[in-house]
């Protein structure tokens, strides 16, 4: 705990505080929130079809940050020994010793508390269902130890984002189909790009007997599975568009989303481009389609 807290009689220099904040943001990959926040707010606006209150938007943001912090910290803690053996991940904070497990546990607690507080502040309904994503976050890091379907565990975790935004507005399961379609799109999209990301660890996964489509099928066949998943993802998004949105002003953004999914497959060999940059833009394209289409 000494890494996170100092006594009041021993003030910490501002440079040290900034260094630690940078370390914690790097640890949880704070920039990856760009994947989830547009999807959360897509769920919000799809459900409300209007501009919600600033209070609700702020609480949704807080819940998203808390949930993302908890999810990434759980993943890093559960996989720390695997990461220590993987040349690609050995320099991460826990394997390298730049962060201790107690520090990570405190960060996990912080994320869970922030998430729980935000869910409770929105409504008792959202608070009661708030443990569901946490259970998924705990479970999916273990999936690659026994099933190649682990990619769908990652997708399922992020598919909670649009549902969370939907439930923050609706606070019931009534009329869930549009929110469910957005969630299924997210599940398929994320599972597909997780297969692309796993190509970085093809040899390591085989050596460690970890399960993935790439390790079981080989890179080319696994990327074929990824392309099919992204094709189905676009089909689900198109169904959502024609079923619920039906605003031609938003149609160009639907096409942009399809083009980005296609580009992600064409540039799958460049994981930095496909996984990080294209996906960040794609999330905002989906949000833009929903925002423009329902208001």
Residue locations for each model-derived region?
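Cytosolic, membrane-interface loops and tails of multi-pass inner-membrane proteins
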Residues: 5-22, 72, 76-99, 194-220, ...
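Extended hydrophobic alpha-helices typical of membrane-associated regions
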Residues: 19, 232, 239-295
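Intramembrane alpha-helical segments
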Residues: 21, 25-26, 62, 92-177, ...
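Membrane interfacial helix-start motif at the N-side
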Residues: 22-35, 98, 144, 212-224, ...
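Small-residue-rich segments of transmembrane alpha-helices in multi-pass membrane proteins
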Residues: 38-43, 154-169, 216, 278-293
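Membrane-embedded alpha-helical segments that form the functional core of polytopic membrane enzymes
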Residues: 38-80, 88, 109-119, 127-139, ...
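Multi-pass membrane catalytic core of lipid/isoprenoid biosynthesis enzymes
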Residues: 57-62, 80-130, 207-248
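Residues within membrane-spanning alpha-helices of integral membrane proteins
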Residues: 105, 109-112, 130, 134, ...
């Amino acid at each position: 705990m000494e890494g996170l807290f100092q006594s009041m009689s021993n003030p910490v220099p501002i440079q040290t505080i900034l260094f630690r904040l940078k370390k914690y943001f790097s640890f949880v990959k704070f920039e990856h929130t760009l994947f989830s926040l547009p999807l959360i707010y897509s769920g919000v606006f799809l459900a409300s079809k209007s501009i919600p209150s600033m209070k609700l938007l702020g609480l949704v943001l807080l819940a998203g940050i808390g949930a993302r912090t908890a999810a990434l910290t759980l993943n890093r803690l559960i996989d720390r020994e695997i990461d220590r053996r993987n040349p690609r991940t050995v320099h991460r904070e826990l394997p390298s010793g730049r962060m201790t497990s107690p520090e990570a546990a405190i960060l996990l607690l912080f994320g869970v508390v922030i998430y729980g507080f935000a869910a409770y502040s929105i409504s008792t309904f959202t608070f009661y269902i708030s443990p569901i994503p946490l259970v998924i976050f705990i479970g999916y890091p273990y999936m690659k130890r026994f099933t190649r379907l682990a990619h769908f565990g990652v997708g399922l975790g992020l598919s909670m984002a649009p549902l969370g935004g939907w439930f923050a507005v609706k606070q019931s399961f009534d009329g869930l189909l549009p929110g469910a379609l957005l969630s299924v799109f997210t599940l398929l999209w994320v599972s597909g790009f997780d297969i692309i990301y796993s190509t970085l660890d093809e040899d390591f996964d085989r050596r460690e007997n970890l399960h993935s489509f790439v390790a079981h099928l080989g890179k080319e066949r696994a990327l074929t599975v990824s392309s099919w998943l992204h094709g189905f993802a676009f089909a689900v998004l198109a169904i959502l568009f024609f079923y619920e949105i039906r605003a031609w002003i938003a149609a160009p953004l639907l096409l942009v989303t399809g083009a980005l999914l296609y580009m992600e497959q064409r540039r799958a060999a460049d994981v930095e481009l496909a996984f990080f940059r294209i996906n960040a833009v794609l999330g905002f394209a989906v949000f833009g389609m929903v925002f423009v289409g329902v208001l």
